[in-house]
Amino acid sequence: MEPGIPPMIDKAPAYSHVLIAGGIGGATADFLMHSLDTVKTRQQAALYTNKYNGMVKCYSTILCEEGVFHGLYSGVCPMLIGSLPATALFFSSYEYTKRHLMSNYNLPETLCFLLAGFVGDLFASVVYVPSEVLKTRLQLQGRYNNPHFQSNYNYPSFRGAVKQIAKQEGMKTFFYGYRATILRDIPFSGFQLLFYEKLRQVAQKECGQKDIGVFRELITGSLAGAGAGFLTTPLDVAKTRLQTMIRTTDKVSDDINSGRYFFAKDENSKSKSAASLVKPKIGIRHVLGGLYKSEGLLGLFRGFGPRIFWTSSQSSLMFVFYEGIIRLFNKNNVLERD
């Protein structure tokens, strides 16, 4: 070990391995958990219907009415296209920032983990936010010409959605809810990595070795995801509402124009969604305030059950795959020093 370099940094994997393991691990976990993410999105955005109350009820309703691919796995294409490069960029940025802070600055280890998580997600957000907009809208829509749920979106395909949004709403639409997304994901990632690193250290002390095994990795990853998910649920609800709104300058109701309400009912719809006429230039602060006024504290935690289940499960799977791929590199004797 070189003098002055913390043991954690000296034994760290190569950045190229972090890039590969992060991309594969993140995308695989996101794919496996996508159906639950669809359930969470429907619950958060379906304002004026009780159709999707309850995680199990919502899951079974979508499955029975719309099927797997066009229902529970709607929006999976933009998710994968965004997830692979985004998680690869996230893990590599996180590792670089963490090592740089720990090697060059006299900062507490806890703060290094937290700040590195913030930076990693900030870099990754440039890639995943546009895909998140597409994914969220397609999840809310479900199948094309969906007779079971009216979301005010009806894209024939993933490519059709890209073309229609770009033509009718402009390219800036792909970054709708960007501020809300990074305000949700930057703290989420920071807390997730902080919790994971600290819990992993506890597990390493308990078992007396660096490799804590798959079971402990599942537990530490799950707890890290659950804790971070709980703290950021209101921001996740606001992000979903912002990305599924249809912006318009048309006059709607006096309540909406006065800023008292931010979601309008479409009386012709059999079931209503958040994709309704709204006041232009609505921000995350306005959405959170409107949610609290109209739905109370429970409105801020709408979709809490599936979100916590998703963040804990996705986090555990992601870290298991990530650590497993890193171990494969080590076992194959290809670990290199940067």
UniProtKB/Swiss-Prot annotation:
Transmembrane segments: 13-33, 71-91, 110-130, 176-196, 218-238, 301-321
Major localisation: mitochondrion
One Pfam family matching this protein: Mito_carr
GO CC term, one of those recorded: mitochondrial inner membrane
Keyword terms, alphabetized: Membrane, Mitochondrion, Mitochondrion inner membrane, Repeat, Transmembrane, Transmembrane helix, Transport
Subcellular location: Mitochondrion inner membrane
Domain of life: Eukaryota
Alphabetical list of InterPro entries matching this protein: Mitochondrial_sb/sol_carrier, Mt_carrier_dom_sf
Repeat (Solcar) residue spans along the chain: 13-100, 108-202, 216-328
An annotated Gene Ontology molecular function: magnesium ion transmembrane transporter activity
Database matches in SUPFAM superfamilies: Mitochondrial carrier
Gene3D superfamilies per UniProt: Mitochondrial carrier domain
Any Gene Ontology biological process: magnesium ion export from mitochondrion
Recorded topology in the membrane: Multi-pass membrane protein
Protein family membership: Belongs to the mitochondrial carrier (TC 2.A.29) family.
Job of this protein: Mitochondrial solute carriers shuttle metabolites, nucleotides, and cofactors through the mitochondrial inner membrane.
Name the record gives this protein: Uncharacterized mitochondrial carrier C1442.03
Organism: Schizosaccharomyces pombe (strain 972 / ATCC 24843) (Fission yeast)
Phylogenetic lineage: Eukaryota, Fungi, Dikarya, Ascomycota, Taphrinomycotina
